[in-house]
Every structure is written in structure tokens, then in C-alpha cells.
């Protein structure tokens, strides 16, 4: 607190000298200058006049001493409150007329004046100053919808919104027309090509069955059955008068198995051994 008082004293001394200078040059009263300073800064400074006579011939000179009060904070708060209350303007009470719009302009060239347009349907505000999207408007719309549902009537629609008309299907239409339209809408099913059967794989059992069939065929005839040399070739003994008596040529019948990819050479011929001649 003492530090604050010392600071205020150091500030008040040049302020007092400035007030005296205003009095001497511009003939402004010292008290008036100090009061203005206190009002602006919130300080409480008082100036005391002391009459001092230097000589008998000279006129009396006044001395001013600046005095600072001990509670500058309270006085500063008071002066601030007074300045705020003085700066606040009072609310303008304008009488409203019922026939015109109740809106009052708050800014612009017509500030404080009432709107002169007459609203429609005995409304309080005109179309320009109507309160939109308010809570009351939403509540009234909801109440209207509930009343319409209970009464069974359609709710009032807003402007610019088109109502969707329900689609009516006639009951007296021909079955032929419906069937033709249904057939038109259907697409033709694509024709599927038959699948090719997969290639059959040959096994050892199928080859054995073929050999058995060949033996059964030759057993029914007078000629002897063909012989298998073990390499897959079948040959038969057949004698002819045209051939020489010493050598008997046998024709070889190639036997192809289903599992074998490469056929045997047809030009291969086998000659009978000496054991066959003896028989």
C-alpha cells in the first residue's frame, strides 16, 4: 500500500505543476484541471493554495501544494462507475401502433422508428420482418399435422412443394395384353451346345478282353488262333502252294492297344523256326 501511495505522489506532482502552468498561460482554474484529471484517471488529488509574500512592494504570490488521499483505489472505482452510468444511453420507449408492423429499426437512418408497412391477415410483423424458423412456428406446424391425422384430412402443404399423386391401376384389363407384355419383357434363353464326351482312357483290363475276344473268334474257324510273341504283335501260320517248300512265310497282323500311341510297323515279318517245320 505504501508503494502504491508513493507512485501516486510521484505522478501527482507533475500533474499539479501542469495545472499551475495552465492557469498562468491559459487562465484555466487549477481546481478544474485537477477535477478533470481525477475523473479520467480515478485518482483523488487535491491542490491547496498558499499565499506567500516575498516583499512589501511585490504582490502576493500563491503557491499550490498537491495533496494525495490515502485510498486512491476506492475513489477510482467510484469514478469508473459514475463514468459508466453516464455513458450508458437509456432505452428509447417508443409507442407502438397496432395497425402497422411491430418491428423497430435498431440501426441505420431509421434507427428508433417503427416499420410503417401493414401486415396481412392481422399478423404482427410484415413479410420482411417476420420471424422465421422459430420455436412457435415449428410447434404450430406439428400441432396442425397431429390434428389432421386425427381428423383424417390431409395436412396443409407448404408453398413450392408438389404433392405426389397415387398411381391408379385399372381393374378391367385383358389377360392377353398382360401376357404379351410379360413375354415381351422376357429375354430368350441362350441355346447351349451339347458337350463332347471325354476321351476314354485304356487300361490293361480292356486290352486283355480284346485278346480273349480274338482267341474266341479264331477257335470257331478251322485256322489256328494267332500267336502273340510277347511284344504286342500277333502272327498266324498259313501255308501256300505258291511258296517254296523249304521256307514258310507268315504274315504279321499288328495288334494295337488302346494305351499305345505309336502303332507297330506293318512291314515287319517273322519267319517260322525249324521247330515249326518239324511239326
UniProtKB/Swiss-Prot annotation:
This is Uncharacterized protein 032R. Residues 136-279 are annotated as: Disordered. Residues 228-238 have a biased composition (Low complexity). It comes from Invertebrate iridescent virus 3 (IIV-3). It comes from the Viruses.
